[in-house]
Amino acid sequence: MTRKIAFYGKGGIGKSTTQQNTAAAMAYYHGKKIFIHGCDPKADCTRLVLGGVAQTTIMDTLRELGEDAVTAENVINTGFDGIKCVESGGPEPGVGCAGRGVITAINLMEEMGAYSEDLDFIHFDVLGDVVCGGFAMPIREGKAQEVYIVASGEMMATYAANNICKGLLKYAEQSGVRLGGIICNSRRVDNELEMMEEFASALGTQLLYFVPRDNIVQKAEFNKKTVVEYDPTCNQALEYKELAKKILENDMFVIPKPLSMDQLEKMVERYGLMD
């Protein structure tokens, strides 16, 4: 049975980098068949898996060529180790609703049978915070069953993660979606591991994995590759291998208990991350 996963996190946290490296690790080390559906109007959720190729998005195809042109051949590309990739895209800057584009794109993929039964995982890589109904769609309508939140020990990253949990709490009963855990993409801030463990525990979930910071991630990106493709024997690639294994074996799925703003600020203050 295909597992449908949504990756959420604050913009700039490294969510798409983490998601793509995890997908690459699942395929390369664990032999899994992966489909990545990018749900970010920047359309950068699949770039590393595709070797830097700028993918034609579903919304661009709809705008320029019409719905009949949205075919698997036109919008789905295959990247590293057979990973299939599609990008929702978004409206022209300043016009329309990007969240609406996510809804349209997912519906079109379902109608054309793109989420085939032979897939082991579908990754929905979703823009930052749950800022509107469109970006909440993967969790609101049960498109994804599991959510992993990419965060760090910085205040705004934990604030965004907490907001995402509020969205999860709102939709969990109707859609069946559950939180699988927090993935810390380390920024090397003081007491980061300890704070993220406490934050995850307060939410009623687990710190699924702590991804250390390593410059090879940037080197791989300069070469338009995931770390797993760039150097599959390096330490960081093996970290992603272990993260993928944690997701594969995860059996802790919860409805989160979001913190109040006061609770969140007090926790951050305790760890000395605020002036």
Swiss-Prot record:
Query: GO biological process: what's one of them?
Result: nitrogen fixation
Might you give the EC number(s) for this enzyme? Answer: 1.18.6.1
Q: Which residues carry this modification: ADP-ribosylarginine?
A: 100
| Free-text comment on the cofactor | Binds 1 [4Fe-4S] cluster per dimer.
Where is [4Fe-4S] cluster bound in this sequence?
A: 97, 132
Keywords recorded for this protein, A-Z: 4Fe-4S, ADP-ribosylation, ATP-binding, Iron, Iron-sulfur, Metal-binding, Nitrogen fixation, Nucleotide-binding, Oxidoreductase
Q: Which GO terms describe its molecular function?
A: 4 iron, 4 sulfur cluster binding; ATP binding; metal ion binding; nitrogenase activity
**Which cofactor is recorded for it?**
[4Fe-4S] cluster
Q: Where does ATP bind?
A: 9-16
Q: Which reaction does it catalyse?
A: N2 + 8 reduced [2Fe-2S]-[ferredoxin] + 16 ATP + 16 H2O = H2 + 8 oxidized [2Fe-2S]-[ferredoxin] + 2 NH4(+) + 16 ADP + 16 phosphate + 6 H(+)
Q: What does this protein do?
A: The key enzymatic reactions in nitrogen fixation are catalyzed by the nitrogenase complex, which has 2 components: the iron protein and the molybdenum-iron protein.
Family designation: Belongs to the NifH/BchL/ChlL family.
This protein is called what? Nitrogenase iron protein 1
Upper classification of the organism: Archaea, Methanobacteriati, Methanobacteriota, Stenosarchaea group, Methanomicrobia
Q: Which gene underlies this protein?
A: nifH1
